[in-house]
Amino acid sequence: QLDITPLCSEETMVACSPDSPYGDVVSPRDLDPASEIVVSWRKSVQDWRDHWFGLTTAPLLYADSMQVVNTFLGSEMMWAIVPAAAARALEKEGRAKICRLTDPPPERVSYLITRRGEALSDAAQLLLEDIRTEMRHIPGIQLFI
């Protein structure tokens, strides 16, 4: 048996080149899907993408890690849908400008999964506290525990 507890939720944002002409808030209608780097495989983001761009619209690139976004985001029109923590890390490194969406995909929820009836180890407690400390300072993240 497991206990599944929501840990946090994260807004989903657009990461684009620092030289991008996009403003602080962008409509999905203003995004060119041919310039998109798809890095999220969450069904809710895929459904959002299908809604705005159609089922047959191909992105520029499918990526399996944020490192790919970091590498390819140099062109002013390239963009990617990323969760808040990744967005802020890219922004802090000067690698991306972050834009909010007028109609974003659903927020990403992360969970703490533990064995029912077992207390967290001291190491796990420390890790959880470190996560809380780091995440409470990131705009776009809501902590639940």
Predicted regions and their residues:
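C-terminal regulatory
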Residues: 2-77, 86-107, 125, 129, ...
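Catalytic strand-loop-helix junctions within cyclic-nucleotide turnover domains
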Residues: 118
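A short beta-strand structural signal in non-transmembrane regions
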Residues: 110-113
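Short, conserved charged micro-motifs
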Residues: 122
